[in-house]
């Protein structure tokens, strides 16, 4: 089964908790603090595996949670870092934030990696807080929470050649002849509803990857008939093979078919106009095909359009087509697809990391008049504080003051004894 778009949830591993411990050894008076740091949580990394061709694995498992780091130990021993969770994806996978649709990574080459959800830092042990003023701190820090994000994975096939055209013009039949691919073939429209890939080898030992794309219809560039799902796979092909039913057996005019498909390609992505194209006049074994081809050439009236007449039924001129495709591929330069897509979409692509929002905090009111403080920075500190330790609670209060939260609460009208909430935890405001 071919799957080219999925939505999944990611939760990177939390950092391990630091520990409060002291050095207790014979003949070592005033040993001091000896609590070790927690280990770092596991990040979630996407890696390209050239052996994959679909996102099928992500259809049945949509939630991924990485492991947390181990806790710190006494004698200043650091907790073990968690092993990163590596998710394999096929070449051509684009990772977007499900909320903002920002492109987080565009993975093309085999082995390419992108860290999309970063694991939390391990919490610090009490020895890390020692100072001349407080040489034996009796508190430690919890691990930092790992990032949590929903992403959309979108696959754009990486094929050298894309077969385009109206339904039932012979695209799947051609692919089955020139490669070992076994696409579904039937005497009805839209037999192919998912792209098929095949590796093609010419008699002079040249090879390329060909994609049989589902049939297009008028309005495909506007999404009609699942047009967007099909057209996106054309974007990354280097050569377009435009197949036309020259017999007109479906009651359509070959020249009109040619114009409509090219207009849809241009409307979807204007750079596709510049992509090398070979026109395949198929079904030349049928009645009226020769006359239709002569009229077609007359209507185009452009010698630069490369037209190859053939019959997939009789296997005529197949080698001529394959040689022409191989020649076009050798002549075309490498195309930087990612750059083109960024210019069109106006996106800022962030590869190998996800940068969260840096908002400090916001203050709102609950229905019971309690003040609610929210924001990534303060919520991160809240989760990393051990509220079973009075010194840790006092440190959290100092951090709130240094961030300006106390002053902001006063400005909002908060008075002595009022309730302040952070992530469900309740505090009493004290002047």
UniProtKB/Swiss-Prot annotation:
The gene is obg. An essential GTPase which binds GTP, GDP and possibly (p)ppGpp with moderate affinity, with high nucleotide exchange rates and a fairly low GTP hydrolysis rate. Plays a role in control of the cell cycle, stress response, ribosome biogenesis and in those bacteria that undergo differentiation, in morphogenesis control. It is an enzyme of class 3 (hydrolase). It holds the Pfam family MMR_HSR1. Keywords: Cytoplasm, GTP-binding, Hydrolase, Magnesium, Metal-binding, Nucleotide-binding. This is GTPase Obg. GTP binds at residues 165-172, 190-194, 212-215, 282-285, 311-313. GO terms for molecular function: GTP binding; GTPase activity; magnesium ion binding. Belongs to the TRAFAC class OBG-HflX-like GTPase superfamily. OBG GTPase family. Monomer. Residues 1-158 form the Obg domain. InterPro entries: G_OBG, GTP-bd, GTP-bd_Obg/CgtA, GTP-bd_prot_GTP1/OBG_C_sf, GTP1-OBG_CS, GTP1_OBG_dom, GTP1_OBG_dom_sf, OBG_GTPase. Its main location: cytoplasm. It is found in: Cytoplasm. Residues 159-330 form the OBG-type G domain. Its cofactor is Mg(2+).
């Amino acid at each position: 089964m071919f799957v080219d778009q999925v939505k999944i949830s990611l939760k990177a591993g939390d950092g391990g908790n630091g520990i409060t411990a002291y050095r207790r050894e014979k003949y070592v008076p005033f040993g001091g603090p000896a609590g070790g740091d927690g280990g770092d949580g596991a990040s979630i990394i996407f890696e390209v595996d050239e052996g994959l061709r679909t996102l099928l694995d992500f259809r049945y498992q949509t939630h991924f949670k990485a492991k947390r780091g181990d806790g710190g130990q006494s004698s200043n021993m650091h907790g073990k870092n968690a092993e990163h969770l590596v998710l394999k994806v096929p070449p051509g996978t684009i990772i977007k934030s499900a909320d903002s649709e920002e492109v987080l990574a565009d993975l093309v080459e085999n082995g390419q990696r992108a860290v999309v959800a970063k694991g939390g830092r391990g919490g610090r042990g009490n020895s890390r807080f020692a100072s001349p003023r407080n040489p034996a701190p009796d508190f430690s820090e919890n691990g930092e929470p790992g990032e949590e994000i929903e992403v959309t994975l979108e696959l754009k096939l990486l094929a050298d050649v894309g077969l385009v055209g109206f339904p039932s013009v012979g695209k799947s039949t051609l692919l089955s002849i020139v490669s070992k691919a076994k696409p579904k073939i039937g005497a009805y429209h839209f037999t192919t509803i998912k792209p098929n890939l095949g590796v093609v080898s010419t008699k002079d030992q040249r090879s390329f990857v060909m994609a049989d794309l589902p049939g297009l219809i008028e309005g495909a560039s506007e999404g009609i008939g699942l047009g967007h799902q099909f057209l996106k796979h054309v974007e990354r092909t280097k050569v377009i093979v435009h197949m036309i039913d020259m017999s007109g057996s479906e009651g359509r005019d070959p020249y009109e078919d040619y114009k409509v498909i090219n207009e849809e390609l241009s409307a979807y992505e204007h750079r596709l106009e510049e992509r090398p194209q070979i026109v395949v006049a198929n079904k030349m074994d049928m009645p009226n095909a020769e006359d239709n081809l002569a009229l077609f050439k007359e209507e185009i009236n452009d010698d630069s359009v490369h037209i190859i007449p053939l019959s997939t039924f009789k296997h005529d001129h197949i080698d001529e087509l394959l040689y022409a495709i191989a020649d076009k591929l050798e002549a075309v330069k490498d195309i930087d697809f990612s750059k083109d897509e960024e210019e069109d979409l106006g996106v800022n692509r962030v590869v190998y990391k996800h940068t969260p929002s840096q908002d400090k905090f916001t203050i709102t009111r609950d229905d019971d008049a309690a003040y609610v403080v929210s924001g990534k920075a303060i919520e991160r500190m809240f989760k990393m504080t051990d509220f079973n330790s009075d010194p840790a609670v006092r440190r959290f209060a100092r951090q709130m003051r240094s961030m300006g939260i106390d002053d902001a609460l006063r400005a909002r009208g908060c008075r002595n004894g009022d309730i302040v909430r952070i992530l469900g935890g309740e505090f009493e405001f004290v002047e």
